Structure formats: C-alpha cells, structure tokens
Amino acid sequence: MAVALAPRGRQWEEARAFERAVKLLQRLEEQCRDPRLSMSPPSLRDLLPRTAQLLQEVAQARRAGGRGDPGDPGGSGNFLVIYLANLEAKSRQVAELLPPRGRRSANDELFREGSRLRRQLAKLAVIFSHMHAELQALFPGGRYCGHVYQLTKAPAHVFWRERCGARCVLPWAEFESLLGTCHPVEPGCMALALRTTIDLTCSGHVSIFEFDVFTRLFQPWPTLLKNWQLLAVNHPGYMAFLTYDEVQERLQAYTDKPGSYIFRPSCTRLGQWAIGYVSSDGSILQTIPANKPLSQVLLKGQKDGFYLYPDGKNHNPDLTELCQAEPQQRIHVSEEQLQLYWAMDSTFELCKICAESNKDVKIEPCGHLLCSRCLAAWQHSDSQTCPFCRCEIKGREAVSIYQFHGQATAEDSGDGSHQEGRELELGQVPLSAPPLPPRSELPPRKAKNAQPKVRFLKGNFPPAALGAQDPTPA
C-alpha cells in the first residue's frame, strides 16, 4: 500500500509546491507596483506575472497527464523540485529588497542608479529572466520536452545525450565530471568560475537549456573552455548579469574615449552576445552581432576601430588564437537522394523556397538548408521558426556547396582525417513548407556522377560582422 501511495504523495507535494510558488510570485507582484521600479528588460514587473502564468500552465498539464514520470533523477519531476525550490529562494531574496505590501515607502538606495541594492535587484531580475526562459524552453505550452530537447550546436547535443541520456538536469558536481571527459576543467577557482557562468539560474545544477546557452555563447565546440577562459575569465570587457541600463551607465564614464566597449550575454536573447560601445561622436550604442563566434566579432570590431578599449582600459587582449580555421565538415549526398531531386526537376544545391539561388545557410538546430536571401526575408517577417519544419531558429551557419566528380570524399590538399563523408537526410521540403513560387527556368540537370558537396564554413556568414544596432534593450 505504501508503494501504491508514493506516486500520489509526490503529486500532492508537487501541487502544493506549485501553489506556494504562484502565491509568492503574486505577492511579489504587489510589492513591485512602485513606478520607480520600472526598468528596461528584464523587468520584474513584467516577469513575475508571466512566470506565474507559465507555472499554472505546467501544473495544469501535469494534472491532466496523470502520474507523469516516476521521479527519476534528471526527469521532469526532479527538475520541478529543483526549480520550484530555487524559485522560492530567489523570490524571498527579492522580497527582502522591496518595501512590504501595503507600504509605499522604500529605502531610497533601492531607486538610486548604481547603488548596491539596485545592483542586487537588477541581478535578481536577470536570474528571474533566465528561469522564465528555462521553464518556457523545457515546458512549452506547459508540457515537458526536456527528454527530446535539441541543443543548437550538434557536438554539444551529441555530448549531452551520450553522457547524460534523457535527463534534462544534473547536479553540478556530476556535470563537471562528465564535461571533464572531453573538456578538462581545472579544479578550484577555475571550476567555480565555470559553474558561475553555466549555472544561469544559480540553482547548483546544470540544465540542458543552460548548457545549450553556454555552448552557443562560447562556440566553437573543439575549443569551448579555451574560448570561455579567454573571453569570460581573462577579458576585462566581459560583464556578467548586466542589464541594458547598467551597460549604458557603466559606459557613461568613457564617453570621452571612443572605442571603449564591454560585452555581456544578452538578457532577452539567450545564447547571443550584446556589445555596448562608445561611438566616435561620444554616444553609447548597443548591438547584438550576427551569429558567429564572439572572438571574430571583437577582432573585426577592433580592426574597424569600434572595439579598442575594453571597459575603458588601454590594453585590448589579442584573440587571434581563437580564430584558427576549423576543419570543414562534409556532407555526402547519396545517388538515391540525387535521383529524388532530379525526379522533381530540381537539384540539391538549389534553394527550395525561391528556386533561384543556391543554398548557402544551415539553420540550427534543425539543419535545414536554404539561401541567405530567403532566410533574411523570412525572418524579416518576424518569423523565428524554420520555414520547413517550424523548429525555432536558434542559430545559423554559412555553408558552401560545390560539385564533386567521382567517389572521393576529401579534397586533395590538407589532412583528410576529418573529411569523412556522411549521409545528408532528406526533408528539405516537408508538407508544412511554404509554397514555392512559379519557376520559368531551372538549371540543367547535373551529370549523374556529379555529386554536390557541402562545406560548413565557420565565421563566414554574409551579414555585417558587427550586426545591426539593436533598437530595443537586450
């Protein structure tokens, strides 16, 4: 009988934890009504009701789904226990900073820009933003997807699934040990700094979502921890848990020194960087650069005279060692796949949306290929999902397709050890794809012994290296 009651007992405890968390967030929302607490994103006044609503959706889906998972380590039940306990702890920290309910007056220091209390509140707002994004990613629409969550970078996805299986969260100590099997971590201060960077929600655990964000920020995978060390530990321009407003405030001291800059993980676009810098006329601009390794963006910005003085300091670290050319990945298109394209009176390399330009972009994480012009037009229409499979677009990578005659799978020059061909799965035009425009002409069919090859070119994406200026807080 005790065994039979165990799942029901877990459900009851989980339901109570949801209720406590929602009520706590609602009380915090009442404490945040002072208009002076209105900040640029992430704003607690905006995040608290959205998080409460999402929690209610998750709770409702859990009730409708019955028992859910049996409480296995790293599953949805285990994640929620960790998440709700952390949410309660962070909520109480916020409550201690805010005026009690029913009292409008508060410590003036809380509203003074740059004060200790204001900084603490801003950092907690960033953590709440991370927690909302994590819950939304692992429970879209309230339903758990952590066991099938797709990391953006393919090598990171392979690492997680091979070593962590279907789990979506691990204690830090276990994760550190697993990561050390392919990226050794120095014990002591370096390991503590790494934990601070990866553990976005400050829970003492690492979720698959947090690891996804980390590997996007410090790509590419082969030099992941080296990138992190040079960019986050040693670089004076790196700022953690900083908001848009705080970047503006910090750079105010350097408005007479154009080229001063700092960079931080974006608060609103997790997995991307936001760079603030002083322009030639002394104004402060913030931008989210194109999806490419940060080291390449900073080097290009240094060359162009934008990023010269990290946090106002005269010494700008040399990042050229992070920009070594990576081995090109090759995709082999089989004879059977080519026959299917020929049967459609098309070719593999032709973009299946416009049917005019060749494919030159790979969408991450789904891997679909199209031309950069069509992707830009698609995203300009405010769509952030793949036009073929509707998977969220988290990144993009430039590709180059060229004709290859014969059966070899590697170029003549260079070491061919990394140039093994692999099959590319078809699926470029699922049923949900947008309709193709009329085509008056198509290129002639290629000879059957001519097979297109695909090269993935790191850091060679067509848009401007520095990215467009972001008009909204990041």
Positions of the model-derived regions?
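N-terminal alpha-helical scaffolding segments that mark the starts
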Residues: M1-R103, N107, F111
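Short interface patches used for recognition in eukaryotic signaling and trafficking proteins
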Residues: P7-R8, L230-N234, V333-L338, A355-D360, ...
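Amphipathic alpha-helical interface elements that mediate macromolecular binding in regulatory proteins
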Residues: E19, K23, P42, P49, ...
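Ordered, helix-dominated protein-protein interaction surfaces in large eukaryotic regulatory proteins
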Residues: R27-E30, E57, S177, T181, ...
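Short, flexible/disordered secondary-structure transition segments
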Residues: C32-M39, R62-D72, V94, L98, ...
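Accessory, localization, and substrate-recognition regions of eukaryotic RING-family E3 ligases
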Residues: E109-M344
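RING-type zinc-finger domain of E3 ubiquitin ligases
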Residues: W342-H405
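C-terminal flanking segment of RING-like E3 ligase catalytic modules
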Residues: P387-A474
